[in-house]
Design a protein with these regions (language model features):
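C-terminal/domain-edge helix-coil "capping" segments
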Residues: 133-166
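N-terminal segment of the mature soluble domain
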Residues: 31-78
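N-terminal export leaders
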Residues: 2-10
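Bacterial Sec signal peptide processing site at the extreme N-terminus
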Residues: 15-35
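Surface-exposed short loop/turn segments
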Residues: 73-118, 125-140, 156
């Protein structure tokens, strides 16, 4: 009983010291608009889904551009995997994962609110045929992290957009 009380007291002291130093959990970046429409994405695009999830906390994602204050149009959404290095026997040793995302932001009428942007991320990773399953899982994790990075960059750019009349 005494140990539990000491543990609780120590946890409370740690939280109080964190609050006292100004520590706060990261909050979503506030956006200067309430409604956004996403267009130009392929059906079931992983990047579009990641954007929808991230935007859900800061704006309402609407299906029709006429209902939105801002429209984000994907002009390019490519995920590529290429071989960077191989052995003399032809076995793959290193691959490169690359995501390209080009987009523009406009009003529902099509008036540009920002210059078109192109985001490109590339990451190299080692590959081993003897650990193919593990490398496949690592590749999927890398792609998730790259998409999260792109979503963060898009949200920061959207935070600087000022919708017409607002």
């Amino acid at each position: 009983m005494r140990r539990r009380r000491l543990t609780t007291l120590a946890a409370a002291a740690a939280l109080a010291s964190l609050a006292g130093c100004g520590f706060q959990l990261r909050r979503p970046q506030p956006l200067p608009f309430a409604r956004i429409a996403l267009q130009g994405f392929e059906a079931r695009s992983p990047l579009a889904e990641a954007l929808r999830r991230a935007l859900r906390d800061v704006a309402q994602v609407v299906a029709q551009p006429q209902q939105a204050q801002v429209v984000l149009v994907a002009m390019e959404d490519l995920t590529q995997r290429s071989i960077v290095a191989s052995t003399a026997t032809g076995q793959v040793r290193e691959i490169q994962l690359r995501i390209q995302f080009g987009f523009r932001v406009s009003t529902p009428e099509g008036t540009p609110l920002a210059a078109p942007a192109q985001l490109v991320l590339a990451r190299d990773m080692s590959y081993s045929e003897t650990a193919a399953l593990a490398k496949e899982l690592e590749e999927a994790q890398q792609l998730r992290e790259m998409r999260a990075d792109i979503v963060g960059q898009v949200l920061r750019r959207l935070a600087s957009v000022r919708p017409a009349g607002g």
